[in-house]
C-alpha cells in the first residue's frame, strides 16, 4: 500500500469521527508525520533520504514536546489508524498495529512483565488511560476499556473492562443485548480464561 493510500485510509477513519472532516483532527496530522517518517526511513531515496529524515525530525519534535506522543517511525501500523485526542500516547518502535485501530488519549503500549512488545490486531479500539504491557497479543475486533492494565493476551472479539478486569466475548454481549431488547433479565456472563 502506498503512502497516499495509507493516508486516505486514515482520513476515511477520521471522517466518521464526530462528524468533523479529517483535516480538523490533530490525530490525523500526528499519524501523517509518522507515516512520512516510516516511508522515508524504509524507502531507497538515495541522497534525498537524509534531508527528508531531517524534515521528519523537525515535524516530530513538537509532537513529542507538546503533545507527548511517542510514535517512532519504526512502528508498523496498518491503514485506517485513528488517534482521538492525541496526548500522552506511547508506543515502542517494535510494536505491530493492525488495520483500522483507534487509540484514545493517555494510552501506553509498551514493555512489561513478559518479554517483547504488544501486537494489536485489526479493528481494535483502546480507550483512554489503558496500558497494554509486554509481549501480548490483542485479537481482532477487541475493545480495551478505559484505565485497563493488560499483561496477558486477549482473544479476538472481546471487550476488556476494568474493575474487575475480565474479557467477555462480543457474541455474549450481543446475546445479552438481544435478550434485554426482548425484555428478558440478563445474567452476568462468565469471563474467559486467559492464557499466556
Q: Which residues does each predicted region cover?
A:
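Terminal amphipathic alpha-helical/low-complexity segments used for targeting or macromolecular assembly
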Residues: 1-67, 173-196
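Structural signal for interior beta-strand "rungs" in well-ordered beta-sheet cores
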Residues: 65-168
Amino acid at each position: 500500500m502506498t503512502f497516499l493510500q495509507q493516508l486516505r485510509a486514515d482520513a476515511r477513519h477520521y471522517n466518521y469521527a464526530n462528524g468533523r472532516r479529517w483535516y480538523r483532527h490533530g490525530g490525523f496530522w500526528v499519524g501523517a508525520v509518522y507515516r512520512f517518517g516510516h516511508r522515508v526511513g524504509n524507502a531507497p531515496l538515495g541522497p534525498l533520504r537524509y534531508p527528508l529524515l531531517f524534515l521528519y525530525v523537525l515535524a516530530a519534535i513538537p509532537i513529542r514536546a507538546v503533545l507527548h506522543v511517542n510514535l517512532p517511525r519504526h512502528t508498523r501500523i496498518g491503514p485506517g489508524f485513528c488517534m482521538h485526542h492525541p496526548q500522552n500516547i506511547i508506543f515502542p518502535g517494535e510494536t505491530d498495529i493492525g488495520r483500522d485501530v483507534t487509540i484514545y488519549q493517555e494510552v501506553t503500549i509498551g514493555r512489561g512483565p513478559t518479554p517483547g512488545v504488544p501486537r494489536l490486531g485489526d479493528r481494535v479500539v483502546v480507550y483512554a488511560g489503558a496500558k497494554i504491557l509486554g509481549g501480548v497479543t490483542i485479537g481482532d475486533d477487541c475493545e480495551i476499556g478505559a484505565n485497563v492494565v493488560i499483561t496477558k493476551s486477549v482473544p479476538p472479539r472481546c471487550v476488556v473492562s476494568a474493575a474487575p478486569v475480565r474479557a467477555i466475548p462480543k457474541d455474549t454481549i450481543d446475546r445479552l443485548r438481544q435478550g434485554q431488547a426482548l425484555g428478558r433479565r440478563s445474567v452476568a456472563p462468565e469471563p474467559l480464561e486467559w492464557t499466556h
